[in-house]
């Protein structure tokens, strides 16, 4: 199934953090926090302004982004755990 978000919504796949610390200690799933970094999978066309014009989003598919701990709504699409959030929930794009 292909999913296209509406308006200023963005679909993000979380990027999982390391399973092990630098010192070699393995972190169990129960002690891990949900990652706040992800890859943009799909973007909507943008929000409309008062004149009805569509304002394009600043992020695009493939961007690596940072977002808040409680941002977005968790969904499962084609067996993948994804987040749908507004572009305003994204704090920034990570330059690689």
Curated annotation (Swiss-Prot):
GO terms for cellular component: cytoplasm. The keyword Cytoplasm applies. GO terms for biological process: chaperone cofactor-dependent protein refolding. Belongs to the GroES chaperonin family. The keyword Calcium does not apply. GO terms for molecular function: ATP binding; metal ion binding; protein folding chaperone; protein-folding chaperone binding; unfolded protein binding. The gene is groES. This is Co-chaperonin GroES.
